[in-house]
Swiss-Prot record:
GO terms for molecular function: ribosome binding. It is found in: Cytoplasm. GO terms for cellular component: cytoplasm; ribosome. Residues 99-178 form the PRC barrel domain. Keywords: Chaperone, Cytoplasm, Ribosome biogenesis, rRNA processing. This is Ribosome maturation factor RimM. Binds ribosomal protein uS19. The gene is rimM. It holds the Pfam family RimM. SUPFAM superfamilies: PRC-barrel domain (SSF50346), Translation proteins (SSF50447). An accessory protein needed during the final step in the assembly of 30S ribosomal subunit, possibly for assembly of the head region. Essential for efficient processing of 16S rRNA. May be needed both before and after RbfA during the maturation of 16S rRNA. It has affinity for free ribosomal 30S subunits but not for 70S ribosomes. PANTHER family: RIBOSOME MATURATION FACTOR RIMM.
Length: 178
């Protein structure tokens, strides 16, 4: 039996619409490379607000889509009940990263300050732009520069000077007026 209390589940994708009549579903991966979602097992599905373990039976490409077959999902009707359900994995299965590399879930919620020690806000999400990732920083309600949100490129050493996950702080070389 899986003890959900001791696990931290991270969303890595989402089940999409059904495919065919034998229980296959399209899948949307939020991993860096779409196929990497299959490297992280076991999967958990968020059903009615609760993470439920599931087993992947098979997967393949169909045109440009990834499709999956889950164990005990053998017909279209059962598959339809899982459409748009989030897929999560236990953070313990993620590999350790090299220094300067971070998982997005570790950065979200961090407070961002610049070199002048100005509190720029809190990371609420991350964006992928192709050339580099971007921190989406929600400013405090009384921001001196009138900003509600800042987009700060996550360029380690160039813009991002330090990340301290223990204190949930990111220090950036970034003008607070931007």
């Amino acid at each position: 039996m899986v003890n959900m209390e001791q696990q931290r589940i991270e969303v890595v994708g989402k089940l999409g619409s059904t495919y065919g009549i034998r229980g296959w579903l399209r899948i949307y991966s939020s991993t860096e490379y779409a196929e990497s979602i299959f490297d992280y097992q076991p999967w958990f599905l968020k059903i009615k607000g609760q993470w439920q373990p599931t087993e992947l039976e098979s997967w393949r490409y169909h045109n440009n889509d990834l499709i999956v077959k889950l164990k005990h999902v053998d017909d279209r009707e059962t598959a339809q009940t899982l459409a748009n359900i989030e897929i999560g994995v236990d953070l313990a299965v993620f590999p350790e990263l090299e220094e300067g590399d971070y998982y997005w879930h570790d950065l979200i919620g961090c407070n961002v300050v610049n070199l002048e020690n100005y509190a720029m806000g809190t990371v609420t999400e991350m964006m992928e732009t192709g050339s580099n990732d971007v921190l989406v920083v929600r400013a405090k309600s009384k921001d001196a520069f009138g900003k509600q949100e800042r987009l700060i490129p996550f360029l380690y050493e160039q813009v991002v000077k330090r990340v301290d996950l223990n204190t949930k702080t990111i220090v950036v070389d970034w003008d607070a007026g931007f």
